[in-house]
């Protein structure tokens, strides 16, 4: 980056800091009210733009709490072609409610999924639907709602304390915004992350005395699934496959397939990409492996051998986190 661009980015980042800091001060001083509700609300979000594992975290919480609560997930529905409040139904798709909400709706039939840019209104509508616990997707900066428990995520390979405000970096607000979180989860860690490395990160993150620091990993399945069949990836060793992704960071998925011996041709599209028939013609000639999120958009297109690779969100010391959340939301 040349000197002139650095100066421009620095000035823009300073302006961004002044705006976001002023807004946060208004909430901190109570000059703008944050609303609470008579049912527990759990917020999942991050300080940085881009993928930190919010979707796997939401799905983890759904699996853990839906057996005991009528769970509702509320998202703004990023890049949807609709407006206002929508309670997901069989008439909806990724275009009408957004990629992640449609994935939740498709996978979990025992919960309510809704989208609304105005979270306060969306929560009220979900309460009328009989929801007992609400999960807010990507809502750390949405201070109009004060959650019962706030989870802040940060990517292991791009931790927020090493980042800068936009546009110089990827932060949506100052690093000190992390103090609003009840816990911090470092995501996408190596499965075998050492205690020494955990201690190193803890010293740098410096969680407050009221905050717990957790570490999580993405575990990739050794099986791929279509609408009506599955395959063991080991069967595809030394075979050519087309990997199709429209996510922020597909490196882990690509590495997993190559480590298993697949010959991978990677078609990498922007996050939340809406696939065209002309795109499909480029990669439908081989077995196609994609993410769960992309599968929801590709499954109705003309692709004979389309499979998705599931992932599991593994939190180290997850029972401690679940006990902490359960204690906070027990009314």
Where are these regions (language model features)?
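A transmembrane-helix-recognition feature enriched in membrane-embedded lipid enzymes
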Residues: 1-40
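Residue-level signal for inorganic ion chemistry
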Residues: 15, 55, 104, 137, ...
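Walker A (P-loop) phosphate-binding motif
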Residues: 24-90, 191
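Hydrophobic residues at beta-strand termini and immediately following loops
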Residues: 44, 74, 154, 216, ...
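Short, polar loop motifs at secondary-structure junctions
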Residues: 76-79, 138-141, 248-250, 291-297
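Phosphate/Mg2+-binding loops and adjacent switch elements
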Residues: 80-208
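C-terminal accessory "lid"/substrate-recognition subdomains
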Residues: 159-289
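Short, flexible loop segments at boundaries between secondary-structure elements
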Residues: 270-274, 305-331
